[in-house]
């Protein structure tokens, strides 16, 4: 009799454990933040930012907040000076990692600035807040006022047959940075129509001028015009969205200042192009890039980036 009671008790404990596991799984599933939820999390953050009310944000006890790589108290920095949000709003959501990123514009004391935000959520509270503010007086190129509406292509789903895995998306983005370092566009899976926008300005394909021809992104790499970028460090591939073919990365371009860019392709020479002098190649500096790639059918079709200028070898803060 005693043995039967023990067996029965053990069975009940097993069933109880199974019920507990199921309840835990259901609770986790119900608290998971999907694409729409993450979009809302970002909107709540932006609304609090514009209202200058950081107390509206639910954070973990050990939340980390940075602006332009500098760690600071939530409520400092742009929280003090922002006026309003612009109309350009590009969102990247990654439910698997519970992260959402945002590219937009803001008004700050009457001037247009670029705003990038990355949020990571844990247990329905923000645990990571990484922000980027690029101001027109900061010495970087760009046409900020070009950014008014997000092209529809960024919100289109990739057909199942043309989708890449999360690992493939990160690999393709990493090859882009390898191609810059090596001066080799052939190792990067560029689509023929690849379009690159940096700080609101179209940088690939370039627009032909009297001193240089129009060049695709891959052709630019082959000319070694980016040799002044000695290395690309602290590569972080933080969000991936296979449904839309997006991968979001944050990297640091290191410019030692003693390497001059050259245009040495046959096409460039034939068109009478001369070596170019980039201001960023004239002195030691670092640029932090937040860059999103759109990949379809294994090819990079679109690249969107915000570029900020920092002191040489500045820590990324993460």
Locate the predicted segments by residue.
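C-terminal and inter-domain tail/linker signature
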Residues: 21, 25-318
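Bacterial N-terminal signal peptides that target proteins for export
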Residues: 1-12, 20
């Amino acid at each position: 009799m005693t043995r039967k009671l023990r067996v029965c008790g053990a069975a009940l404990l097993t069933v109880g454990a199974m019920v507990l596991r199921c309840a835990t799984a259901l609770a986790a599933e119900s608290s998971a933040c999907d694409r729409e939820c993450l979009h809302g999390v970002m909107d709540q953050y932006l609304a609090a930012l514009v209202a200058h009310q950081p107390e509206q944000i639910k954070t973990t006890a050990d939340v980390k907040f940075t602006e332009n790589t500098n760690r600071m108290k939530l409520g400092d920095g742009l929280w003090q000076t922002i006026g309003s949000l612009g109309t350009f709003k590009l969102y990247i959501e990654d439910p698997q990692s519970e992260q959402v990123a945002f590219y937009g514009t803001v008004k700050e004391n009457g001037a247009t600035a670029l705003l990038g935000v990355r949020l990571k959520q844990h247990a329905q509270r923000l645990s990571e807040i990484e922000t980027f503010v690029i101001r027109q007086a900061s010495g970087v190129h760009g046409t900020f006022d070009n950014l008014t509406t997000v092209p529809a292509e960024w919100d289109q789903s990739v057909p199942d047959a043309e989708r890449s895995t999360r690992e493939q998306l990160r690999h393709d983005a990493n090859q882009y940075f390898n191609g810059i370092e090596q001066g080799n566009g052939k190792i990067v899976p560029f689509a023929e129509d690849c379009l690159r926008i940096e700080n609101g300005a179209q940088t690939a394909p370039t627009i032909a001028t009297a001193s240089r021809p129009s060049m695709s992104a891959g052709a630019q790499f082959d000319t070694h015009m980016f040799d002044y970028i000695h290395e690309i460090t602290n590569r972080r591939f933080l969000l991936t969205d296979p449904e839309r073919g997006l991968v979001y990365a944050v990297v640091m371009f290191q410019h030692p200042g003693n390497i001059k860019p050259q245009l040495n392709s046959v096409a460039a020479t034939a068109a009478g192009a001369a070596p170019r002098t980039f201001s960023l190649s004239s002195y030691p500096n670092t640029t932090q890039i937040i860059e999103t790639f759109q990949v379809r059918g294994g090819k990079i079709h679109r690249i969107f980036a915000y570029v900020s200028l920092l002191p040489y070898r500045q820590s990324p803060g993460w």
